[in-house]
Amino acid sequence: MGLERVVVIGLGVSGRSIARFLAQKGVCVLGVDKSLHALQNCPYIQEKYLENEEFPSQVDYVVRSPGVSKEHPWVQAAIASHIPVMTDIQLAFQTEKFTERESLAITGTTGKTTTILFLEYLFKRSGIPAFAMGNVGIPILDGMQNPGVRIVEISSFQLADQEKSYPVLSGGMILNISDNHLDYHGNFSEYFQAKQNLALCMRNPDDLWVGDERFYGHLYLEEVQKYMRLLDKESALKPLYLHDKHNYCCAYLLAKIEFPISETSFIEAVATFNKPPHRMEYLGQKQGIHYINDSKATTVSATETALLGVGNQAIVILGGRNKGCTFSSLLPALRKAAKSVVAMGECAQEIARDLEEFPVTVVKNLSEALLCAEEQAVPGDVIVLSPACASFDQFRSYEERGAMFKHLVGMEEVLL
């Protein structure tokens, strides 16, 4: 590999991980980014290019960071020149290390991170070394060096290029599929196909399981329902949202492919697991009004799921940057769960048009949205931030948006 010349497109967290991995293998790394600062601060690249420069010659293959679109001009230039294009997932799956021990992967539209982290927690609590990596935060090329079971969160961005078969996974789960990232994939068919590409990574195709009966009724696991009923019988458990129960049960089924973890251990793990923040995070109540931070709900389907767990007196804060979805599909869930909507941000007017049959107030930003919601609320109501949109119109991330909501609510103070 020492003579290979490899282009890495995008030098964020994943891109730097890719460049570091390749440099350690003796590859000549050519880095490309829209930011000169990113290029200057990546010590692993031998040649630096801004993305508006011409595609270089004598390139063996291209590795794009997960967030870099297949329509990127350098990706298109590589394809036109019949140069292979891949992501860090394919690069990792080609290494011998990935066949040395058990590796599990989860993809889906919503719930991936919570499910991955619960699965890691379940393993560790059962005395089984495990390490979560991939889209969950630790790039796969860094995380695969850790001991124990590999648990990989894979996004549709990373699966979109999956054309070859890399049979390295001992188990896989497609949690669910609904409209998402259509601004990236172009249409639902392309997004749907990207998720299904996980099948190309399985050692045994029978160990790819599906948690969504809408698209895979014949493959849907009856065991999911069985273990959800098991959790329902456990009166000692704290109340669980329906989607959380579903995700925990999917994780348990995936764990049991290789390890005989008991139902008792599973129930104890559910009882003691703390979800990551910004996912139907109950903040408390003030003057009888309850507050929920669901900033992670960046899709219409995620908000639909959230509305299943908020009763029927919710004031829902929607808005941000649309990811290519329509909001009218929220109407059935809103009619059951909400009394009104406050629409904010870049696509607030679009939300108001799509939901014209429902009470909607349009505001500029999150601060105004919370103030408007509180003016409408009475004791017993729930104000829930579940935007159904990306955050990038006004925030750097959904985490920043959620943190701002918590600050505005006054979570730092005693709310109960």
Curated annotation (Swiss-Prot):
Entry superkingdom: Bacteria
Assigned keywords, A-Z: ATP-binding, Cell cycle, Cell division, Cell shape, Cell wall biogenesis/degradation, Cytoplasm, Ligase, Nucleotide-binding, Peptidoglycan synthesis
Chain's gene name: murD
Species, as recorded: Chlamydia trachomatis serovar L2b (strain UCH-1/proctitis)
A GO BP entry: peptidoglycan biosynthetic process
Residues noted as binding ATP in the record, renumbered to the chain: 108-114
Cited Gene3D superfamilies: Mur ligase, C-terminal domain, Mur-like, catalytic domain, NAD(P)-binding Rossmann-like Domain
Catalysed conversion reaction: UDP-N-acetyl-alpha-D-muramoyl-L-alanine + D-glutamate + ATP = UDP-N-acetyl-alpha-D-muramoyl-L-alanyl-D-glutamate + ADP + phosphate + H(+)
Database matches in Pfam families: Mur_ligase_C (PF02875), Mur_ligase_M (PF08245), MurD-like_N (PF21799)
Main location class: cytoplasm
Family statement drawn from the similarity comment of this UniProt entry: Belongs to the MurCDEF family.
Location within or outside the cell: Cytoplasm
Pathway(s) served: Cell wall biogenesis; peptidoglycan biosynthesis
PANTHER family: UDP-N-ACETYLMURAMOYLALANINE--D-GLUTAMATE LIGASE
Name this protein carries in UniProt: UDP-N-acetylmuramoylalanine--D-glutamate ligase
